[in-house]
């Protein structure tokens, strides 16, 4: 079977010579996008080409453009007009076919700054969205393709930053040498602290500040860095109490020899009078054994329930 070839028709669907047309600029071309129903209305077509110059105007059917049967030349048209009828009679049919495939074929065929419009200047929300996604810009009467073809690349000449000169290294100064010979200090310049207070100042009682006063139920304490004299006063009072306690202990303190004199349980030791073990008749008035029976020297004496046990 011989292979089949598919050819794409790039010629306009209609080639009618208008009886009269408006004068148009030969440099500008117009693309008319018509719904399929207009092909059956010959009077509409004749009226259409009396308005637009056929030499600068191309007519294509929306269904053929949407199906990809028509290949449009790139960057050719200054105006793309969708034939919806001036009164909107064919709006529903035309906008129903104005889909993304139509925008994909029409937008590349538009020149920079070309316009996309309808006869009644109406676009639905879906058509607006598809036009913006295709790269067109919303205008008052339709959409416009931005003219970016005349742009030229302009090199940016950025001034190079001048390299800052390195900061000079700081000069390290040797540390100053401190010598005792430089200090010409005399004893005459020193002040004796004791001479700053008079005799009356020394007699005055030390009054601690209110914050140093002890709280109720608590012992008076001085601060660690006390400068009001409270710490010295408390230390002096504690020292006096210790000295008084030591004196009271020294009154009752006995030497080892004194203990041996009174300890009659030690063999060979007797009292100063030597008669403590003989009985009350032979004991002194201050003898600690008064009231006890006679016992042998060295015999152990125990006190049980305030009763001497021999």
Swiss-Prot record:
Keywords: 2Fe-2S, 4Fe-4S, Cytoplasm, Iron, Iron-sulfur, Metal-binding, Mitochondrion. Its main location: cytoplasm. Residues 1-30, 165-184 are annotated as: Disordered. GO terms for biological process: iron-sulfur cluster assembly. Disulfide bonds: none annotated. Residues 273-287 are annotated as: Fe-S binding site B. It comes from the Eukaryota. InterPro entries: Anamorsin, CIAPIN1, Dre2_N. Pfam families: CIAPIN1, DRE2_N. Residues 155-202 are annotated as: Linker. It is found in: Cytoplasm; Mitochondrion intermembrane space. Signal peptide: none annotated. Coiled coil: none annotated. Monomer. Interacts with tah18. Interacts with mia40. Component of the cytosolic iron-sulfur (Fe-S) protein assembly (CIA) machinery required for the maturation of extramitochondrial Fe-S proteins. Part of an electron transfer chain functioning in an early step of cytosolic Fe-S biogenesis, facilitating the de novo assembly of a [4Fe-4S] cluster on the scaffold complex cfd1-nbp35. Electrons are transferred to dre2 from NADPH via the FAD- and FMN-containing protein tah18. PANTHER family: ANAMORSIN. Belongs to the anamorsin family. This is Fe-S cluster assembly protein dre2. The lineage of its organism: Eukaryota, Fungi, Dikarya, Ascomycota, Pezizomycotina.
